């Protein structure tokens, strides 16, 4: 369906493209396409793995081909962390963010909340301000030139010690970038990602409980490779949003809680397929979530690595589930309602969704 092969698919493609979207689960470092990795490596004199040690890095083409064959989450992460080493300057981070925002805007994204991973960059010697200010530059440009609204979510990495996350959290607070009482609150939430199975489920509990007291928005990756208990642990330490969450259906009682508390799941179907969490997009519990009243949005996760930006993810879901226009309206509206934006912006986006649906209701 991306691209469409029949007139009927063309109509659906036009609708899904036009439908105003909110993206809540995309890692900016996961938007490093192979051409950008190689060009930034040359510019910044960064040595990528030699072709003899890792043939994937022989060329842009070989790296692109390797991206289609990840065996697991950790296999993907090994490439993900190598890729981000090419980022060195504030302008690099701004360029990366802008590259994503342009693509997202072209595919109908009106609001996006993006993850970034400062810990790894800081561990290799980059200054905190270089990272944050670069991404903020990209966000401001997107808002000014594209008219989309943006939010930055600072992600803690589960494979690193709690102390590393605590230092980052303290730095963000001291710099005034985080929290309602921050001098310049450019970071709008906290997240937790990287390897799921292995680290303690509640690794960041001390940080999250403190952040909750400051009314800082909290989310966490859970229920991707780990079972539903990882989702419960994230909720119990203060998360009000769950990233992935596809294992939720294994626990009916927990699913009732998630629906009742209007927790938003940021589902990434193509990512789940690429990382072997499911055998097909049809195994992602989209229909089950709709029937149970569980709110979710559909997202691209790390689109440069998984070969699918948000429109392709929407198309993949439509191909797998044959949803109705009413289903898509609900998904889009729940994405707005679960966003970390003010009521005025939410109402504006809900109006845009309504106008889009009106144009297509009699066609599909």
Swiss-Prot record:
GO terms for biological process: adenine catabolic process; hypoxanthine salvage; nucleotide metabolic process; purine nucleobase catabolic process; purine ribonucleoside monophosphate biosynthetic process. Its cofactor is Zn(2+). Its main location: cytoplasm. GO terms for molecular function: adenine deaminase activity; zinc ion binding. Binds 1 zinc ion per subunit. The active site is at 224 (proton donor). It is an enzyme of class 3 (hydrolase). Catalyzes the hydrolytic deamination of adenine to hypoxanthine. Plays an important role in the purine salvage pathway and in nitrogen catabolism. Has no activity with adenosine as a substrate. This is Adenine deaminase.
């Amino acid at each position: 369906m991306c691209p469409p092969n029949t007139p009927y698919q063309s109509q659906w493609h036009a609708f899904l493209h036009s439908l105003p979207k909110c993206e809540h689960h995309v890692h900016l470092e996961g938007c490093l396409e192979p051409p950008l990795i190689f060009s930034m490596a040359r510019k910044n004199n960064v040595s990528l793995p030699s072709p003899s040690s890792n043939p994937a890095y022989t060329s842009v083409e070989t790296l692109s081909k390797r991206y289609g064959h990840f065996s697991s989450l950790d296999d993907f992460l090994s490439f993900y962390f190598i890729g981000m080493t090419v980022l060195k300057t504030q302008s690099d981070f701004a360029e990366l963010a802008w590259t994503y925002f342009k693509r997202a805007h072209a595919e109908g994204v009106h609001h996006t909340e993006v993850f970034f991973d400062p810990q790894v960059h800081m561990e290799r010697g980059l200054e905190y301000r270089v990272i944050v200010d670069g991404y903020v530059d990209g966000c401001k440009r997107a808002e000014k030139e594209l008219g989309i609204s943006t939010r930055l979510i600072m992600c803690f990495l589960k494979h690193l010690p709690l102390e590393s996350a605590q230092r980052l959290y303290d730095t963000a607070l001291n710099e005034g970038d985080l929290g309602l009482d921050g001098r310049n609150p450019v970071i709008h939430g906290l997240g937790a990602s990287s390897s799921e199975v292995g680290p303690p489920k509640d690794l960041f509990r001390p940080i999250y409980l403190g952040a909750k007291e400051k009314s800082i928005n909290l989310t966490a990756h859970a229920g991707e490779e780990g079972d539903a208990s990882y989702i419960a642990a994230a909720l119990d330490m203060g998360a009000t949003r769950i990233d992935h969450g596809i294992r939720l259906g294994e626990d009916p009682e927990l699913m009732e809680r998630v629906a009742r508390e209007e927790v938003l799941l940021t589902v990434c179907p193509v990512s789940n397929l690429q990382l072997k969490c499911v055998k097909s997009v049809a195994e992602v519990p989209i229909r089950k979530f709709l029937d149970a009243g569980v709110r979710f949005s559909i997202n691209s996760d790390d689109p440069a690595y998984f070969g699918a930006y948000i429109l392709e993810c929407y198309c993949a879901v439509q191909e797998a589930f044959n949803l109705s226009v009413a289903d898509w309206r609900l998904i889009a509206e729940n994405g707005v309602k679960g966003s970390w934006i003010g009521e005025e912006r939410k109402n504006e986006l809900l109006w845009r969704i309504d106008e889009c649906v009106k144009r297509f209701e009699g066609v599909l």
